[in-house]
């Protein structure tokens, strides 16, 4: 009799657990359906962060994200790929913030150099990535690259150039210049073992590319300390020892 009662109790507990499981499953189904159908979860706000070059409206337009779509129906990878089509975008992430907000966080590439070929100006970033081809670069404040021949290239990829020159392009941009009036205007890579960097009319003779960071910093210190910013001449840091400079009259 005792065993029979225990069996009945176990069966009741089992049925109760089954009913609870079914109830929870149905409740979850109802909640999911409501989330997918209720206007409460439709996209109302799309925010863009991290952009200084590309307008927020352009990024949103390129993403193909639409207000009014359900926030749970999004294929985030598709929208990321859409945004990454712009060569000025280096990286992007998209966050869903319940109930109705999308945050787009971008990291941009910055135009630093240009290569002139005929009537075209090839705009590249510090890593040698081709950002665009223009007919006019007025107001862009870019550094001219000499000694790199470029007739074509695929936008959004590295320019067809040897690895040593690509590395130098990156290293040159890492030099810290504290004087806002002193800016690199031209880099001559015509001869990889006889590099030259120009600050307006002041030529810095780098020589071989080894230790280019320290060489450039030494030259910058000389130009600033000797007040050579608006002068014409050269600073030679191609050898070991103190830099030498000479001015043209």
UniProtKB/Swiss-Prot annotation:
Just give the chief location class. Answer: membrane
Q: What does the entry list under GO cellular component?
A: cell division site; plasma membrane
Bilayer-crossing regions: 20-40
- A GO biological process held by the record: FtsZ-dependent cytokinesis
Does the UniProt entry include the keyword Protein biosynthesis? no
PROSITE patterns, sorted? POTRA
Q: Which residues lie on this side of the membrane: Cytoplasmic?
A: 1-19
The record, for InterPro entries, names:
Cell_div_FtsQ/DivIB_C, DivIB, FtsQ_DivIB, POTRA, POTRA_FtsQ_type
Compartment list:
Cell membrane
Q: Give the Extracellular compartment stretches of this protein.
A: 41-249
Q: Which Pfam families match?
A: FtsQ_DivIB_C, POTRA_1
Q: How does the record classify its membrane topology?
A: Single-pass type II membrane protein
* Domain POTRA: start-end pairs: 41-109
Q: Which UniProt keywords apply?
A: Cell cycle, Cell division, Cell membrane, Membrane, Transmembrane, Transmembrane helix
Question: Its biological function?
Answer: Cell division protein that may be involved in stabilizing or promoting the assembly of the division complex.
Homology family: Belongs to the FtsQ/DivIB family. DivIB subfamily.
**What is the protein name stated in its UniProt record?**
Cell division protein DivIB
């Amino acid at each position: 009799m005792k065993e029979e009662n225990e069996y009945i109790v176990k069966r009741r507990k089992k049925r109760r657990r089954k009913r609870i499981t079914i109830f929870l499953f149905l409740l979850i189904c109802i909640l999911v359906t409501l989330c997918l159908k209720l206007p409460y979860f439709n996209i109302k706000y799309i925010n863009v962060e991290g952009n200084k070059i590309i307008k927020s409206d352009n990024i949103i337009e390129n993403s193909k994200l639409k207000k009014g779509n359900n926030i749970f129906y999004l294929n985030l990878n598709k929208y990321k790929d859409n945004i990454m089509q712009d060569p000025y975008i280096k990286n992007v992430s998209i966050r869903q913030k319940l109930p109705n907000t999308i945050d787009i966080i971008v990291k941009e590439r910055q135009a630093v150099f240009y290569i002139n070929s005929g009537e075209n100006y090839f705009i590249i970033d510090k890593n040698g990535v081709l950002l665009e081809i223009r007919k006019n670069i007025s107001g862009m404040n870019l550094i001219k690259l000499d000694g790199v021949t470029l007739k074509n290239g695929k936008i959004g990829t590295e320019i067809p150039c040897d690895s040593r020159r690509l590395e130098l392009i990156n290293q040159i941009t890492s030099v810290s210049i504290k004087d806002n009036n002193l800016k690199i205007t031209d880099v001559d890579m015509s001869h990889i073992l006889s590099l030259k960097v120009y600050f307006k009319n002041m030529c810095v003779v780098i020589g071989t590319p080894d230790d280019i960071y320290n060489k450039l910093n030494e030259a910058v210190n000389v130009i600033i300390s000797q007040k050579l910013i608006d002068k014409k001449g050269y600073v030679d840091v191609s050898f070991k020892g103190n830099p030498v400079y000479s001015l043209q009259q």
